[in-house]
């Protein structure tokens, strides 16, 4: 297919127009008085959102050269969202500011490679500055503040703080759509997996149709159990000690299942059997997780164990096990805390290494089940459009809160970036020529978020920036919601350090890429010739 090419200034200006198309659409959503953007959907009702990355993903431009710029900026937003889960609008805005200033300097004859190195030096100084002013976040109130600001809703903030308090920072918190109007929180303690009892005859509470075993022993195996002879030696020991038994196996069927049910109905002993969770290699890993959590061993031929040889001390133990038709929950596993910690660290290392989003999600789930628990926030609203928008906000707030727990918090409202201007100024003063010009590009861009938040609130951004700079107080800033100057930390207006840092680094990366671009190659769009005319006059036979 033939290509068309643009070079030099013409190419960069096309990229800039693409960047502006995305940034101008996204930046109206910044801050507490940011506006919404309506996204057209081919089917169904339009989506109303103020989430930067959701808006950016929808934008495709007709001009292929400009579209390259739009796609590059989208990358900055998406990368920020993937790493920090929030800050996409800030990243977009910073990148636009750096591209605008950079192109002015290139037009004046600056060397793009030196500009790039100047930008990198300035960003490094800004990141160090952010680390310096960052404060750790450890109490429930601070967590609620961060979540409330991201979601622009105090109620959601409190729910997220409550969820994180219950399941810990390694726990999994998921957001689901509720069938009711209200937004609620549900917490599952211990390890839960999506497998229920093999037979309804195993229930201990016929009214609720669930089996609850107090202080049971747990047989964990990857084998299919169909012959009761394999289990007899173990069952005799369990009956003698009056224990209750949970079997987690590949399957329990035939004679073995019938015998277990008959003995349960006669009241000889209580036993519940469930199928092992997961599939393939993931099943082996999950069985090992359960074994470590309960202090038992996986009975597997791979490890040289046979069911006939199982002793009581090889079984896991827990405070309580609850089994419903669909789920099994193990609470208070009796595993060795140091072994559990080792396993948690091993899963964390795998999360760092994996490149697959699906694998990462599954590893996060396993980590949560071992480390804390699972919390589900049920988002409810009056209409489907409102529900989608609310779910988006909760997911954003959740990501921002996790980022805050990881790296701490800085004053919000764009003030943190103004606070690191001094750090960047020192770098600017130490450089010369185009290096210095590159660092100055970042210096100017750092003011942009405060300026835009103020503009969205209907006030003059430049006046606000100058007032904040003149105050010389690191926590002094502009509360756009109340339209007043205040101490940002005291007012609870804070941003996660990780979000601000990631937004700045990704914006600089994309801006540097655009400034050092010398040519763009795109396909020449094919002319649509239309469908060939079918043979006329042919009767249908």
From Swiss-Prot:
Record keyword Chaperone present: yes
InterPro entries reported in the protein's UniProt record: Chaperonin_Cpn60_CS, Cpn60/GroEL, Cpn60/GroEL/TCP-1, GroEL-like_apical_dom_sf, GROEL-like_equatorial_sf, TCP-1-like_intermed_sf
Enzyme class: isomerase
Domain of life: Bacteria
Gene Ontology CC, one term: cytoplasm
A Pfam family reported for this protein in Swiss-Prot or TrEMBL: Cpn60_TCP1
Its EC number(s): 5.6.1.7
Gene Ontology MF: a single term: ATP-dependent protein folding chaperone
HAMAP family xrefs: CH60
Subunit note: Forms a cylinder of 14 subunits composed of two heptameric rings stacked back-to-back. Interacts with the co-chaperonin GroES.
Name this polypeptide is given: Chaperonin GroEL
Organism: Thermoanaerobacter brockii
């Amino acid at each position: 297919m033939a290509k068309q090419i643009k070079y030099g200034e013409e190419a960069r200006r096309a990229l800039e127009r693409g960047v502006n198309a995305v940034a101008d659409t996204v930046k109206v959503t910044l801050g507490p008085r940011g506006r919404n953007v309506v996204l057209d959907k081919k089917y169904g009702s339009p989506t109303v959102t103020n989430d930067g990355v959701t808006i950016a993903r929808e934008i495709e431009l007709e001009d292929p050269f400009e579209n390259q710029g739009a796609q590059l900026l989208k990358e900055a937003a998406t990368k920020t969202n993937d790493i920090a889960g929030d800050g996409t609008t800030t990243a977009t805005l910073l990148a636009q500011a750096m591209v605008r200033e950079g192109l002015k300097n290139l037009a004046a004859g600056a060397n793009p490679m030196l500009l790039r190195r100047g930008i990198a030096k300035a960003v490094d100084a800004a990141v160090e500055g952010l680390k310096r002013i960052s404060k750790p976040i450890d109490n429930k109130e601070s967590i609620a503040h961060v979540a409330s600001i991201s979601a622009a809703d105090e109620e959601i903030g409190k729910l997220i703080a409550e969820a994180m308090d219950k399941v810990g920072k390694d726990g999994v918190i998921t957001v689901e759509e509720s069938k009711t109007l209200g937004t609620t929180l549900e917490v599952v303690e211990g390890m839960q997996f999506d497998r229920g009892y093999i037979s309804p005859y195993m229930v201990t509470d016929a009214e609720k149709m669930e089996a609850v075993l107090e202080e049971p022993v747990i047989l964990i195996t990857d084998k299919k159990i169909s012959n009761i002879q394999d289990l007899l030696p173990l069952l005799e020991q369990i009956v003698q000690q009056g224990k209750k038994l949970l079997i987690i196996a590949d399957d329990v069927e035939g004679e073995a299942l019938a015998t277990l049910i008959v003995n349960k109905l006669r009241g000889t002993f209580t036993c519940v059997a469930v199928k092992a969770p997961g599939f393939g290699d993931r099943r082996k890993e999950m069985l090992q997780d359960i074994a470590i959590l309960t202090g038992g061993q996986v009975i597997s031929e791979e490890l040289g164990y046979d069911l006939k040889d199982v002793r009581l001390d090889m079984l896991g133990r827990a405070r309580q096990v609850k089994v419903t038709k669909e789920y099994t929950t193990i609470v208070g596993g009796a595993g060795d805390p140091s072994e559990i910690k080792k396993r948690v660290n091993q899963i964390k290392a795998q999360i760092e290494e994996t490149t697959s989003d699906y694998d990462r999600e599954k590893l996060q789930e396993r980590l949560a089940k071992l480390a804390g628990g699972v919390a589900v926030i049920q988002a409810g609203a009056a209409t489907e459009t409102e529900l989608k928008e609310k779910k988006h906000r909760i997911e954003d707030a959740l990501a921002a809160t996790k980022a805050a727990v990881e790296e701490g918090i800085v004053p919000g409202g764009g003030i943190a970036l103004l606070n690191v201007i001094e750090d960047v100024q020192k770098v600017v003063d130490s450089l010369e020529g185009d290096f210095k010009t590159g660092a100055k590009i970042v210096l100017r861009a750092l003011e942009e978020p405060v300026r835009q938040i103020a503009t969205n609130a209907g006030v003059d951004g430049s006046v606000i920036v100058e007032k904040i700079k003149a105050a010389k107080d690191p926590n002094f800033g502009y509360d756009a919601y109340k339209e007043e100057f205040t101490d940002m930390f005291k007012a609870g207006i804070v941003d996660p350090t990780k979000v601000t840092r990631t937004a700045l680094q990704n914006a600089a990366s994309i801006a540097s890429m655009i400034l050092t671009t010398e040519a763009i190659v795109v396909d020449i769009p094919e002319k649509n010739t239309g469908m060939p005319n079918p043979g006329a006059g042919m009767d249908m036979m």
